[in-house]
A protein has these predicted regions:
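Generic structural signal for secondary-structure transition and capping sites
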Residues: 17, 33, 37, 82, ...
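Cyclic nucleotide-binding regulatory module and flanking cytosolic helices
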Residues: 1-33
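Cyclic nucleotide-binding regulatory domains
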Residues: 16, 41-102
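Polybasic "coupling" helices that flank or enter modular domains
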Residues: 100-103, 108-167
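Hydrophobic (often cysteine-bearing) scaffold residues that line and stabilize catalytic clefts
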Residues: 4, 52, 151
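Hydrophobic residues at beta-strand termini and immediately following loops
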Residues: 35-37, 77, 110
Length: 167
């Protein structure tokens, strides 16, 4: 069990540019419970309030949402990724995405109450979470820039495809 926890620690250490002191990281890991998720199983479900935190230890998860009647994939989570819903964590509103296992997977689950207590008790953990969240937001924005192009590319595309807008 200790080697599995060390593996989680190493994954989390590699996910963020801000290095959390070992004692605080071990405290965070100590709050988690290991859960196995079968292929197709979910840890966070659209339409439900779930503010808890999940760390992928093994496997791959997709973040899916419904667009009308079509299910669309927004992103993927690999080992070391932290999965949480901003809707549920921040606003206590129902989740927009379903976080679904693409294969048999393992996550470590931290209840929001324990997570929030650690943020309140540890300035270093709060800094680490801020950095971690900023990193996630950076990569979501980076993904969108690659899919949609940057502002000059989008402007040129609009000129080409919708010149009437500029008349």
């Amino acid at each position: 069990m200790m080697s599995a926890m060390k593996f989680i620690k190493d994954l989390l250490d590699a996910e963020c540019t801000y290095r959390l002191p070992d004692d605080v990281m071990w405290r965070f890991i100590g709050l988690m419970t290991r859960e196995e998720v079968r292929k197709g199983g979910t840890v966070i479900d659209e339409g439900r309030v779930n503010p808890d935190i999940y760390i992928v230890a093994d496997g791959i998860f997709s973040y899916n949402y419904l667009n009308g009647t079509d299910e669309r994939c927004h992103a993927f989570a690999l080992p070391g990724a932290m999965m949480w819903s901003a809707y549920s964590y921040y606003a206590r509103e129902p989740v927009v995405y379903t976080y679904q296992a693409c294969c048999d997977s393992v996550v470590y689950h931290c209840r929001v109450r324990d997570f929030d207590d650690l943020i309140k008790d540890s300035h270093e953990f709060a800094q680490w979470m801020l950095c971690y969240t900023q990193c996630q937001l950076y990569y979501f924005e980076k993904k969108n820039s690659l899919i949609n192009g940057d502002a000059p590319e989008r402007f040129k595309s609009m000129l080409r495809n919708r010149p009437e807008i500029f008349e």
